[in-house]
Amino acid sequence: MFSLRPTALVSLSVVLFSIQETLSEQQPFVSPGWSDQWWHKSELESYTFPWPIQKVAIIGAGPSGLAAYHELDKAGYDVYLFERDTVPGGNWHYTDETPVKEPIPNADVSIGDFVPSLPPEGVRLPYEEHYEGNVSDELLRAHRGPKPIWNSLQTNAPPPLQQFRDHPWPADQPWLLPHAVLGKYIRAFASFNGINSNDVENPHISYNTRVELVEKCFTSTENGPMRTGWTLTLKQVSRTGTNTSKAVWTKENFDAVVVATGRFNAPYIPNILGLKAWADRFPDRIVHSRQFRRPQLYTNQTVLVVGAAASGVEIATDIAPNARAVYLSIRPRRISNSNSAGNPLSSRWMGRLPHNVSVVPEIKRFLPPTSAIALSSVELTNGTILTGIESIIFATGFRYTFPFLPQFHNTSLTNHDLEHKPKPIVTDGTHLRNLFLDILSIEEPTLGFMCMNIEIQNFKYAEYIAVALSKIWGNKATIPPVTRLWELNERRVMEKGGYGKYFQFLGFRGEREMIRLFTGWLNDAAASHGGRQVR
């Protein structure tokens, strides 16, 4: 998703390939492991929603959440947008403030992003609490969740690949954009739709508001409780003075919910032998890459960067001019002749690393810490012992997590365990399960998800998902009945070789095939039921 200045060199061929793929003539549609045009069959046998869908909650005001709001609002839904941060933008809202430091070892994935904060049991809502001093500051920071981008970060794709279709960039934009420019573009799109944080006249937007819990909603009837949607528990935190703040909890009911919280919320740090002892002994010297902001912090230090995906390579490159030396620890399989964006350390790129960046093997263990981190030792898988390390940055990625959906987490399951009801969406955090097209819960098709795939152009892909959700929930596009959805899901798992880290991976070709699927399905639906077509 992210990239620094060197990407202008190392990803040019990848981006050119993407543009070529986008502009090329459409090939005959090939289903990417889902089915043989299931939508033709679903006209006679389709899922029926148990209640009409009109009022929709969107969780998250990043690019995908804004795209969802734009489409659903245009389609006539009663849409509400909730964002924990102060402004829209998602991961493209940069601040010097860093997130709350992650625990080592990792927290359980179900609370990997945050621990839900619920009002005391039995209190009447709305319920308020007031805070002051350091408690207030830390509450605000934890509540809004500063994003994992750094000061010098630039986009890894040109503007035409990172834009909303109805709001193209001017033609004279540079090839790569500073994060601040893209952030302004996203906020401008929000303003155009009347959903920026300063659009105070819009009662349907709530910034500084975190969704703490999403649970089933029931209505009392003569025949007993009847399921009618979802109840959201909301917590809005606002500053009331220089060092004071207040939190207000409320609840609200919705017919459907869109999860647009992204994939970069719960940091992952591998559980390497001896690491916990180092983290306990040197807590300020071992961080996840989401804490990184400026390279000057590492001036004249010897730094160990762990991870060879985009963030690891580019953080190592960014700090190299300031650092004494940088070690980049990678798994051997990460060096290849591939030009894939999934292999940032291809052999063609190795020579472009700064002279003081040394690529080293994977870490085997951290030897028992001594009185100072620089006097302590790290053993690599090839037997090499590193000493003199003064800081460690784990650029080892993130895990899927939705703390507000505890009923859809089951971290006790492995990739090979059989599932039991309720079927989880999140297990170990490396992938998502039991979603149709990765956009709808199979058990609860009024629960939608935006842009949860890996290696996609989020702006473009989000618009197809938003149209799909709009048409499905408005009965202008059909999906198969739940039994058929489970059959398709089982086929997909089998074709993918089981669950795992790359279960949601699409890449350029996979994204192109999915867009063809959306186009064929949704345009067939438009011909049958009316509504706009997609292209």
UniProtKB/Swiss-Prot annotation:
Example GO molecular function: N,N-dimethylaniline monooxygenase activity
Enzyme superclass (EC): oxidoreductase
Gene3D superfamilies: FAD/NAD(P)-binding domain (3.50.50.60)
UniProt-annotated binding residues for FAD: G60, A61, G62, P63, S64, G65
SUPFAM superfamilies with a match to the protein in the record: FAD/NAD(P)-binding domain (SSF51905)
Signal peptide residue numbers: 1-24
Keywords: FAD, Flavoprotein, Glycoprotein, Monooxygenase, NADP, Oxidoreductase, Signal
Pathway: Secondary metabolite biosynthesis
The keyword NADP belongs to this UniProt entry's keyword annotation: yes
Enzyme Commission number: 1.8.-.-
Function, in words: Flavin-containing monooxygenase; part of the gene cluster that mediates the biosynthesis of the psychoactive metabolites ibotenic acid and muscimol. The first committed step is glutamate hydroxylation by the 2-oxoglutarate-dependent dioxygenase iboH, and the last step is decarboxylation of ibotenic acid to muscimol by the decarboxylase iboD. The order of the intermediate reactions is somewhat ambiguous. IboA likely activates the carboxylic acid at position 5 to introduce an amide bond, and the flavin monooxygenase iboF generates the N-O bond. There are several options for the latter step.
UniProt family annotation: Belongs to the FMO family.
Protein name: Flavin-containing monooxygenase iboF
Name of the gene encoding the protein in the UniProt record: iboF
